[in-house]
Amino acid sequence: MILTVTMNPSVDTRYQLDELVIDDVNRVTPEKTAGGKGLNVARVLGQLGDDVVATGLLGGHMGAYMAELMDANGIKNDFVPIKGETRICLNILHAGNQTELLESGPTIAPEELDAFTAKFTELASKADVVTISGSLPRGVEAGYYAKITGIAENAGAKVLLDTSGASLEAALKSEIKPELVKPNLTEINGLLGTSFTTDDVDELRAALASDARFSDIPWVVVSMGAAGSVGFHNGRAFRAKTPDIPAVNATGSGDSTIAGFAHAIAAGADDETVLRTANTCGKLNAMDPMTGHLVMDRWDEVYNDVVVTEL
């Protein structure tokens, strides 16, 4: 089983407009989905045929509505109830542009976090892979992801951690490390105090190898936008280049990439297959107007066009 964690989920509402007229009425038809990075991961894993359970925190009327959306989408879920109201996030697509309005979300009480820790411990004991994605809600300290990473890894699960900022830094400094981290180039430069470009792969490899924070993490994947990504796994280094595709909605492509990693790692795939699968998922999400959803009938075409080269 693969477990996905979304600590700060949202009801995502998408508006498609030919033009956004400022300071005037814009009539729209909303498309609503159960949102949050971990739920995007869960949706894609469901498409890939994995046994997946989504967990996290839900509260209020929006939380109840979100549970209905998950059930309607066939996403198995086991969330912990909270008193606060689950947030709403707006995504406005207009004239080739994308504008997002994101609520902060509720503040989590200590007893609510304790209840989630107990729930997570129970679910992680049954999981082969755990994905932890996105931001922490208010009231939760930055070291919490490091804490539950240790719980899952001690239970025998492999943790794929997709976060940034203080939460990522705390996980890198912890005694028990995740199986995979996936910072982008800007984030990795911030962590290393460097200014590497997409051409500086050898220098990046050397910097990671000499930094004790990354020494016990089997997979370090650095996403580089249109330039693809580089992956470092147990002393080996790879560059993945992806094909040009007709992008419709790039939101959720990073989450879909994490789903691809989870799917392939859970299946025990070799390094090249892991990277090709993950990058294929990211591209196929960008080709679909729905966030966290793959254009599966293009799988073979895109997968075969992803080039993975060992460095």
Regions found by a protein language model. Name each.
Residues 46, 149, 153, 266:
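Gly/Ala-rich phosphate-binding loop of Rossmann-like dinucleotide-binding domains
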Residues 1-55, 62-65, 311:
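Glycine-rich phosphate/adenosyl-contacting loop at the front of the ribokinase-like
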Residues 47-127, 300-311:
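Conserved N-terminal subdomain of the carbohydrate kinase-like
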Residues 107-109, 136-140, 167, 190, ...:
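Short, small-residue-enriched loops and turns at beta-alpha junctions
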